[in-house]
Amino acid sequence: MIKYAKKEYSKEEVLKVLNPLVAEWFKSKFEDLTPPQKLAIIPIYKKENVLISSPTGSGKTLTAFLTIISELLNLSMKNSLENKVYAVYISPLRALNNDIYRNLEEPLHEIKSLATERGLEINIRHAVRTGDTPSSERQRMLKKTPHILITTPETLAIILVAPKFREKLRGVKWIIVDEIHSLAESKRGVHLSLSLERLEELADTSPIRIGLSATINPLEEVARFLVGYDDQGRPRNCTIVDTRYMKRKSIKVISPVTDLIYIPAEELSKKLYEKIYEIVERHRTTLIFTNTRSGTERVVFHLKQLAKSKGTLKEEQIAAHHGSLSRNVRHDVEKKLKNGELKAIVSSTSLELGIDIGYIDVVVQIGSPKSVTRCLQRIGRSGHKLHEISKGVLICVDRDDLVEDAVMIKEAYRHHLDKIHIPRKALDVLAQHIVGMAIERKWKVDDALKVIRRSHCYRDLSKNEFLRVLKYLSGKYSTLEHHRVYGKIWWDEEAGEFGRRGKYIRVIYTLNLGTIPDEVDVKVYTVTGKYVGNIEEEFLERLIPGDRFVLGGKVYEFVTSRGFKAFVKPAFEQKPTIPSWFSEMLPLSYDLAIKIGKFRHQMFKWISEGKSPERIKSYVIKECKADKNAAEAIYR
């Protein structure tokens, strides 16, 4: 049964159920509980599955971990803490995993110090395991297994078939899925849902599932995605903690010019960057979102040019952050941001999720973020603390984006969120997991189908559809052999069983697992050997020695290339090229598109009825939080 948490527990009631050391630590750090903590900690303590939806800075991550740390502490104090994984934390980003690791360090270290003062010895281990984890570290995890394992969906699927480490997962009691809203509507989420059911099957007892999400809709659907179904087809129990609208916000849409229609593109571009620069000057730290990596590089370059000409900001106070920059470059930017060394940071999507980046007092969105949910997620990065206002400015440079943003803000203030659409019955993902299950052990067909149907994404999978995938994977389509596609499993139709085929299938599985498309990237190095980031092969083909381009907000001169490596040197002469990256467009959400159509219809109706321009523009200013320039452009 899916239900909503209604009862808010007092601080005393919550701390009473926690280990005394955890309670003492909490009281020394926080004056009171946040709304999600008042609603969620007791249900987690009572071993209920919980979905928490709340804005950034509301303490939902700590909410998830408090009970877990408390229970592990109880076991440690009884000398009952075994060498196995008790809690699995899953997030879509490696950077977020590293962030959580660092954020757990402080409470675990401070609680350990409190225990030492009382003559108690505790040792709760936590570790990150992703594709970046060295093999030596993975080997160490077998000997000293982390009690809290921090990982990604893809790595979880890999360790489920790791012969030795999978045994460490049998004792898992808690599973935390962070940023579940970003996973649920993609095939990565479908992939994860099957991994969770395979982990459920492996574990000695049914693990408690905790989902953490920013603003999302509908919550009941996401809850069913998180917890799955029992063998009778009923949703497992889940308590929803809905604190989505607890934080105040201030969002407005503006146009940098009075006339968006006839102004020359060059003049519009100039006014845009001047407006952004003006906002950056007025605020302590500004986070600027573009919708593409190319846009990020372009904005950083022009802001640095303005800083150089005006002299009111230093060029090094402006930085870029996106997925095509090297990990070291991104970490350096994040560190500077946390330390308050940056006035402006420009990102495409890489800072959308909950990475801890310190204090942001305003978010600027250039163009349309294409959905109400994404808009609120981005704006929510400002005013990180609970009592602060999330402040956002949406700047538009064409009328279509302007209308999108105006409608988006109107819907955001009315709490009308886009509905999430969770993919169903993705057979390519199913094929991967059938191979993974075959690697684990020999399966009865009906038993395997039962496990798969527990996933929300496959609850409607028919047996015939399942058998067709088995037929494909077992190589029974003889025509595929002409294309060198061979069977990965064996399937005995009479016995109703299947299992792994060949000794290399584990390698094939781990190398081809996941749903993130492969990108053929060219790695960019300085001539001194420093890794800067990636560019597309197509962009490299257009470069000749001496060409200049921007990467990470810095200008480089192309020297030469060898294979998929490009070598560059810093350049100081300007007029560089902006690299382009493939598949960068964000899709417009269906629900928002419908609302935009209705808004345009209403505008046309009022104009045809002879409603005065002043009244129409006044409506846009009031309801859509638009400035006069934006209202004028929408009317025209």
What are these regions (language model features)?
Residues 60-61:
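Conserved lysine of the Walker
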Residues 272-275, 337-338, 342-344, 348, ...:
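Phosphate-interacting basic helix/loop segments used at nucleotide- and nucleic-acid interfaces
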Residues 9, 24, 414, 519, ...:
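Terminal, basic amphipathic appendages of nucleotide-handling enzymes
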Residues 1-36:
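Pre-P-loop entry segment of helicase/translocase ATPase cores
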Residues 19, 34, 265, 326, ...:
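Ser/Thr-centered flexible coil motifs
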Residues 6, 11, 21-22, 38-39, ...:
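Helicase motor core with emphasis on the C-terminal RecA-like subdomain
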Residues 475, 481-601:
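Conserved nucleotide-binding/hydrolysis modules and their immediate coupling elements
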Residues 54-56:
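The conserved Walker
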